[in-house]
Each structure stands twice: as C-alpha cells, then as structure tokens.
Amino acid sequence: IGHEIGHGFDDQGSKSDGTGMLRNWWTAEDEANFKAKTGALVAQYNAFCPYDDGETCVNGVLTLGENIGDLGGLSMAYKAYHLSLNGKEDKVIDGQVWRSKNREEAMRRQMLTDPHSPPQYRVNGIVRNFDEWYEAFGITPDNELYLPPEQRIRIW
C-alpha cells in the first residue's frame, strides 16, 4: 500500500496538485531538491549492471517512478510497523518476497522495457538508502551494499 501511495509523489504523480489537476505546485526550491534527489536515485540504479558486459544495466530513468514508490513504501511500512508494535520488541522482516530466478534473455528484455527494476535491485537498491537497515543488520563500510550516509537518498 505504501508503494502505491508513494506513486502520488513520484516523478509523475508529483506533477498533479491535491485535486488531481496537472499543474506545477512546487516552489522552485522544492522542485530543485526533488530533482537533485531523484537524479541521484537514477544514478544509483543506472549503476546496477548484472552482467559483465557493462551494457545491460538498469535504466534509472525508466524505473524511477517504481523506485520512488519502493523507497517511499518501505519508509511508510517501517513507520506503520513500529506503530503497530505498541512498544514491543520488533522482529526482523526480510525481502524474500522479491526472490526470483530469471533467464538472462528475459532479464535483459526486462531492463530495456519494464518500468520495474529487477527484483534483486528492488530490494538491494532500496535498503541501502534506508538508515534503519544499517542499524538492524549491522551493515558496515566493508559490506558490498554499504552507502555512506551522505549518499543515501530519502525523498520524503
């Protein structure tokens, strides 16, 4: 649900006002900040290249709306989960829902045409921007997915 709510504020949904009218309602500063953050997210996803050819990579522009939805969705779900605990100890919830196995041809086609990032990047590309993930799993700079705090993206 959080992912779908996030679409209301992604690269497309953010172009409509609160009544659904297509108009620019952003201040110049807010729009510049949004573009800087989404540009950084595009760059992160453009760097996900599952094959050694260096040519078949996730298209960060094509997948931007879905990646924003995933990023916002995780943040909303995490906050809602902690509210539901009412002070009780939390349990670790992982990303197994996105486990998959794809043939190379299908994966290459997906990266050219599908606005959704491949499953492993829908998980790894999002959690590496989420400070709470580092705390929950003790992620340190020697981990492959580690991003320095100043490179982590939080749009909302």
Language-model regions, residue ranges each:
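Zinc-dependent metallohydrolase catalytic domains
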Residues: 8-156
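Short alpha-helix carrying the canonical HExxH Zn2+-binding catalytic motif
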Residues: 1-9
